[in-house]
Design a protein with these regions (language model features):
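A solvent-exposed interaction/effector surface
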Residues: 1-170
């Protein structure tokens, strides 16, 4: 789980209908992704750059994304995190990707959905609330978290972001 950001800011308040701990099933879906690592202070810029690279690749392949951008956090610590920045696709591109880009499957199965509104710098407050929720409900998360960007992280003003956070549970 991401640690606190350098500059704590409050997330925007949830709106009626926003999920907070809603049980869902993540569907199986094919993704085109880039693996990477980032320090926390450059997290958002690193992810935006990864999404731009993925879009350039898909544009060259004449493939349209089949859903919003996602980040799969595969490992975190106080210094930074390992991730897969991904775009879902209806089918894998005809020409296999080369270099840093790969095709695979997004995590699927039972998860809890939470909504974050506002700056990416304020995500620490959302993750703290998620941790408290899991503790209160005595639920154990798997070793990954998924962020799905309901608003386009490349083109949306930072304080207007809407991020669905999915927590796969054991």
């Amino acid at each position: 789980m991401p640690p606190p950001a350098a500059k704590p800011t409050a997330p925007s308040p949830l709106q009626p209908g926003d999920a907070f701990g809603e049980a869902i099933t993540l569907p199986e879906r094919t993704i085109v992704y880039i693996k990477g690592y980032s320090k926390w202070d450059s997290a958002f810029d690193t992810l935006v750059d990864a999404f731009k690279s993925l879009r350039e690749y898909l544009d060259k392949q004449d493939v349209k994304p089949a859903g919003p951008a996602i980040t799969i956090y595969t490992q975190t610590d106080d210094a930074g995190f390992s991730f897969q920045a991904a775009l879902p696709v209806a089918q894998a591109p005809k020409d296999p990707p080369k270099g840093d880009i790969a095709v695979g499957q997004a995590p699927s199965g039972r998860a809890l959905k939470f909504v974050h509104r506002g700056s990416y710098d304020a995500m620490d407050s959302t993750y703290e609330a998620i941790t408290n929720y899991l503790d209160d409900k005595q639920l154990e998360a798997k070793d990954l978290f998924i962020e799905e960007y309901a608003t386009d992280p490349v083109n949306t003003a930072p304080d207007k972001l809407v991020v669905n956070v999915f927590v796969p549970v054991k």
